[in-house]
UniProtKB/Swiss-Prot annotation:
Residues 1-85 are annotated as: Domain I, interacts with DnaA modulators. This is Chromosomal replication initiator protein DnaA. Its main location: cytoplasm. The gene is dnaA. It comes from Dechloromonas aromatica (strain RCB). ATP binds at G174, G176, K177, T178. The lineage of its organism: Bacteria, Pseudomonadati, Pseudomonadota, Betaproteobacteria, Rhodocyclales. It holds the Pfam family Bac_DnaA_C. Oligomerizes as a right-handed, spiral filament on DNA at oriC. Keywords: ATP-binding, Cytoplasm, DNA replication, DNA-binding, Lipid-binding, Nucleotide-binding. Residues 109-125 have a biased composition (Basic and acidic residues).
């Protein structure tokens, strides 16, 4: 029977993105490999959250594969690992390695000091770059939400001035745009120490323009910026209404591009949607490649929490990571804040980080997160698309009704913890396979259709208040 599970793992590893496979399938184990086949198979999940997720999304595929492998139907039971085993694992983690003990501030400080010393060793150009040495590609968690942006960023870092110039990265606050452009800068500075790389926030650029105007030092200002090999401009939306800054940046942009110097820009919205921005700049931002970073999906949120905890010298238990990730969905900054609160609570009270402690530490934070129900989602979607709520439950299949219905189902899956069957019941008693199809359809279309992706973004913001 171990041959079956090994084959099953290989198949899932080929079919699923690495993060989904590592989060949901890899932690499962087959119990009782010597048990007679007629007694069925028992798959052990490490906790209830993984069990529910696998049961809703993957169990049917496992059952289908078992029928093919064993050439007949096989009963598969999905259960949580015994409490004894779980307790032993937690005890071993806390007593043997100390990884789940309260954070040691000295450890984090030492890591940051080491990173700074390494950065200083890169030369005087790096000293003036204003880059954060701790933001690298190695410690950037990658998922569906940012995989395209990361791929483009790596291309630019490996071939500055040649690929995707300018690179325009947009997305909401706290999604990792700043981390990504610092990672580009750090890679270029490390591999090309002779290049002059500079990170500049849009407000700092504005301040430099004002200072040059007041001191009548525009020649020096222009020389400084035009000497750059790589310009990383963060939060360009702050140029709104700052006409002189926009004019100076327009000429700087032209000069750098003409000299085949690399420009990377971040913003909280798509270039054409930036308020108060000169049309000439909008046009030039479209010369290169524009990529979006979206809010992280559940697997990515879990991976981010574990990575951040690891950086603090903590091995975060799965149940704690899933609990935080399930309730806080907006952005990376929100996750980091919640994790810091849990670590501080653990340190202050001298308690091991476990699910009950996380619930205590975050009761105010999670209590303030708006509780969105499926009925609220249905009403919001119906209002947005100007249809009746009853039409979402109907048998109508016209595009004007079917697409909003699929969007509503996708939102129910994204925003609530309801299973596919529960969502199907809420939409006129539809089968769970209909919901699965709707979710997959929207996931696929949102990558290709900017208008649909915009609709989803707006609806999510409305629902999350």
């Amino acid at each position: 029977m171990s041959g079956f599970w090994e084959s099953c793992l290989q198949r899932f590893e080929q079919e699923l993105p690495a993060q989904q496979f590592n989060t949901w399938i890899k932690p499962l184990r087959l119990e009782g490999e010597s048990t007679a086949l007629e007694d069925g198979l028992r798959l052990i999940a490490p906790n209830g959250f993984i069990l529910k997720w696998v049961r809703d999304r993957y169990l049917t595929r496992i059952e289908d594969y078992s029928r093919t492998f064993f050439e007949g139907p096989v009963t598969i039971a999905l259960v949580i690992g015994s409490g004894k085993a779980t307790a032993a694992r937690i005890q071993a983690t806390t007593t043997d390695s100390g990884q789940n003990a309260p954070a040691n501030p000295a450890t984090t400080s030492e890591k940051r000091t080491a990173a700074s010393e390494k950065a200083r060793g890169k030369g005087s150009n790096y000293e003036k770059s204003r880059l954060f040495p701790s933001f690298t590609f190695d410690n950037l968690v990658v998922g569906k939400a940012n995989d395209l942006a990361r791929a483009a960023a790596v291309q630019v870092a490996n071939n500055p001035g040649g690929a995707y110039n300018p690179l325009f990265i947009y997305g909401g606050a706290g999604l990792g745009k700043t981390h990504l452009i610092h990672a580009i800068g750090n890679t270029i500075a490390t591999e090309n120490p002779e290049k002059i790389v500079r990170y500049v926030h849009a407000e700092d650029y504005y301040s430099d323009v004002v200072r040059a105007y007041q001191q009548k030092s525009f020649d020096s200002f222009k020389r400084t910026y035009r000497s750059l090999d790589v310009l990383l401009l963060d939060d360009v939306q702050f140029f709104n209404g700052k006409n002189r800054s926009q004019e100076e940046f327009f000429f700087l942009f032209n000069a750098l591009i003409e000299a085949r110097k690399q420009i990377i820009i971040t913003c909280d919205t798509y270039p054409k949607d930036i308020n108060g921005l000169d049309d000439r700049l909008v046009t030039r931002f479209d010369w290169g490649l524009t990529v979006q970073i979206e809010p992280p999906e559940l697997e990515m949120r879990v991976a981010i929490l574990k990575k951040k905890a690891e950086a603090e010298g903590i091995q975060l238990d799965d149940e704690v990571a899933f609990f935080i990730a399930k309730h806080l969905r907006s952005n990376v900054r929100e996750l980091e804040g919640a994790l810091k609160k849990v670590l501080a609570y653990s340190s202050f009270h001298g308690r091991v980080i476990a699910l009950d402690l996380a619930k205590e530490a975050l009761k105010d934070v999670i209590g303030s997160v708006r509780n969105v129900g499926m009925d609220n989602i249905q009403k919001t979607v119906a209002d947005y698309y100007k249809i009746k709520v009853a039409e979402l439950f109907s048998k109508k299949r016209t595009r004007a009704i079917a697409r909003p219905r699929q969007v509503a189902m996708w939102l129910c899956r994204e925003v609530t913890s309801h299973s596919f069957p529960e969502i199907g019941d809420a939409f006129g008693g539809r089968d769970h396979t209909t919901v699965i199809h709707a979710v997959k359809t929207i996931d696929s279309l949102r990558i290709k259709e900017n208008e649909l992706n915009h609709d989803l973004h707006v609806l999510l913001q409305v629902l999350k208040g």
